[in-house]
Amino acid sequence: MKALRHYNSTMKNQFERFNGLERLYGKGSLQRLSACHVAVIGIGGAGSWLVEALARSGIGQMTLFDADDICVSNTNRQLHALDGTFGQNKVDVMKARCLAISPEMQVNAMATFVTPSNMAMLMEQGFDLVIDACDSFRVKVELIAWCRRNKQKILVVGAAGGRTDPTLIRIRDLAKTEQDALLALIR
């Protein structure tokens, strides 16, 4: 009975925070989003913004992978680069930020890089979606191959590379990638 009260209280709190999503995406959408577990690999220029967008979308659980610390030179492009966060690990700062947005969310901060040698162990958690936002060619290639072999859904993110028109961003098959040198090499 106590567990049911906690669940009802948690769902009420989540509904108050994110009820706009129900209006936007339809009845039951918040429950579906709160049941999702998303992995984000690389918490930099793209990954930091993705993590915050997911937190504000009512995702129930995220696992963040990045071993880097925040540098002052990250300020122009990375969400977590603020006075007071320089020198701190990216995943720890983003975990705190996510919990400030959505206290009921479960955030696993993994201060490690995903590499070909540790990938299988780190990816075996059964994610609903893996988002690759890292900038390592080898890791991107190996991760795409691992996800494909294991029937794991993956979203691969490219770099802005000095582009300034966000209306040109497209979600498409990697084989049809244009205007991104790193992703073009991968396809």
Regions found by a protein language model. Give the residues of each.
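N-terminal charged helix/coil linker that caps or initiates catalytic domains
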Residues: 2-38
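Short amphipathic alpha-helix with an adjacent loop that forms part of the alpha/beta core around
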Residues: 117-126
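Hydrophobic/small residue at the entry helix of a nucleotide-binding pocket
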Residues: 46
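Conserved SAM-binding strand-loop segment of SAM-dependent methyltransferases
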Residues: 106-112
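Conserved N-terminal Rossmann-fold NAD(P)-binding element of oxidoreductases
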Residues: 40-42, 65
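Conserved S-adenosyl-L-methionine
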Residues: 56-61
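E1/E1-like adenylate-forming module used to activate ubiquitin-like modifiers
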Residues: 129-187
